[in-house]
């Protein structure tokens, strides 16, 4: 597979919001991985050119993506893993510590499988203050950065960005509602 555009794999793809932004930035999304069926259906309807994998990302193997990506690898893997475990909202209605807080490892794994040149993580700012467990003060963000380095993605930049600063017409009562944490490596 040859393409003249920058190429992209969308992990934790949801209904395709990151894909839409990546297309606007000149990327060609080749593969999307999403667990929720209704999100896959919406994604496929909005982006029929993308190979959508409806599966738990932990079960996705190289054989599932290799036919859809260039042999030399992709330019970018995005990983917008579920934010519930990092969100400061609704902490009384969910388990504060669960296995979702380590799903960033799957984004790294897919980046390595696809020989990605770069990986972009996106999540709520709460990811920067979440600890591994009640008894371990190690921050999840520090574990993520360590594992990025171990995987060969040690040159990274972190940023908190407010969506409204980039033309997203979403203002709510709380001015930081759409503040998001990004790490690009």
Regions found by a protein language model. Give the residues of each.
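S-adenosyl-L-methionine-dependent DNA methyltransferase catalytic core
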Residues: 1-29, 39, 147-150, 154, ...
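Conserved acidic residues
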Residues: 30, 75, 117
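Short beta->alpha hinge that forms the Motif I/post-I loop of the SAM-binding pocket
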Residues: 34-38, 57
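Short alpha-helix immediately C-terminal to the canonical SAM-binding loop
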Residues: 37-41, 62
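Short, conserved SAM-binding/catalytic segment
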Residues: 43-52
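Cofactor-binding loops of NAD(P)H-dependent oxidoreductases
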Residues: 55, 60-63
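Class I S-adenosyl-L-methionine
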Residues: 63-72, 84-185
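Short SAM/SAH-binding signature in class I
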Residues: 72-80
């Amino acid at each position: 597979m040859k393409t003249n555009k920058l190429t992209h794999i969308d992990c934790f793809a949801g209904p395709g919001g990151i894909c839409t932004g990546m297309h606007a930035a000149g990327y060609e999304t080749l593969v999307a991985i999403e667990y929720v069926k209704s999100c896959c259906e919406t994604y496929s309807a909005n982006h029929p050119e993308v190979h959508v994998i409806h599966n738990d990302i932990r079960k996705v193997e190289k054989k599932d993506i290799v036919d859809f990506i260039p042999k030399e690898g992709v330019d970018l893997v995005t990983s917008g893993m579920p934010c519930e475990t990092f969100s400061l909202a609704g902490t009384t209605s969910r388990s504060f510590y669960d296995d979702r807080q380590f799903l960033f490892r799957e984004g790294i794994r897919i980046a390595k499988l696809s020989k990605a040149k770069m990986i972009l993580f996106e999540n709520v700012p709460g990811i920067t203050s979440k600890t591994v467990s009640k008894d371990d003060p190690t921050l999840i963000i520090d574990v993520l950065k360590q594992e990025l380095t171990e995987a060969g993605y040690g040159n990274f930049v972190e940023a908190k960005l407010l969506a409204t600063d980039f033309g997203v017409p979403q203002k709510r009562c709380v001015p930081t509602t759409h503040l998001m944490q990004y790490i690009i490596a």
